[in-house]
């Protein structure tokens, strides 16, 4: 998680440069990746197609592409398992599995905030607030925000520029002992 943050990896498609043998294409949007491991991928890109590289978020299977949108924020770690994983994860893992593990609430008060600004009026913010609610319960609220103007001018009146970014996500977690 910290390695991804220090390398400024903000979308699943950017993982290819940081994880050996993992390729990610984004034909359906920046945060809806199609993973390929060691050359095993899929050739049909219909929305109900199941990939041979399974995607999990906190060990919950994300099957069809519309249910995969993934924001890489406040992650504890990323697990990439190469090769068939049918014994561990079951179906749709002939090419491998990618498991995104988010940070769990800790039993102490802490938080962080990261802000950024870039070209094409890009603004980024992400952070988390962790609160201990007594000795046995803790809560964590994490968020991410990314906005960038498009760099292709759309000549259609009233329509936004092409390739703009508008990503917003929030995640709340409660943990008890």
Q: In which residue ranges do the predicted regions lie?
A:
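Non-catalytic regulatory/gating segments with a bias toward low-complexity or hydrophobic composition
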Residues: 4, 16, 78-83, 98-100, ...
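Transmembrane beta-barrel wall of Gram-negative outer-membrane proteins
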Residues: 110-112, 117-177
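N-terminal Sec signal peptide and the immediately downstream disordered periplasmic leader
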Residues: 1-7, 12-18, 130
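Extracytoplasmic beta-strand/coil segments of soluble accessory domains associated
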Residues: 13, 17-60
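Extracytoplasmic
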Residues: 7-10, 19, 30-32, 50-52, ...
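Short, polar/charged loop or turn motifs at beta-strand boundaries
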Residues: 1-9, 37-39, 57-58, 115-117, ...
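Short acidic/polar hinge/loop motifs at secondary-structure boundaries
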Residues: 45-46, 52-84
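N-terminal periplasmic accessory domains that precede
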Residues: 34-36, 56, 77-80, 92-115, ...
């Amino acid at each position: 998680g910290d390695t991804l943050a220090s390398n400024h990896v903000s979308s699943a498609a950017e993982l290819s440069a940081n994880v050996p043998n993992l390729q990610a294409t984004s034909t359906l949007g920046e945060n809806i990746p199609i993973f390929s491991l060691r050359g095993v991928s899929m050739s049909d890109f219909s929305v109900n197609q199941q990939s041979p590289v399974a995607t999990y978020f906190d060990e919950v299977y994300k099957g069809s592409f519309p249910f995969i949108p993934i924001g890489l924020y406040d992650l504890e770690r990323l697990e990439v398992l190469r090769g068939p994983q049918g014994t561990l994860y079951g179906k749709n893992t002939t090419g491998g599995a990618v498991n995104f593990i988010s940070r769990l609430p800790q039993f102490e008060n802490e938080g962080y905030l990261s802000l950024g600004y870039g070209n094409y009026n890009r603004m980024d913010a992400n952070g988390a607030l962790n609160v201990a609610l007594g000795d046995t319960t803790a809560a964590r609220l994490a968020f991410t925000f990314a906005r960038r103007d498009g760099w292709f001018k759309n000549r259609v009146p009233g329509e936004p520029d092409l390739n703009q970014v508008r990503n917003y996500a929030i995640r709340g977690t409660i943990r008890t002992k």
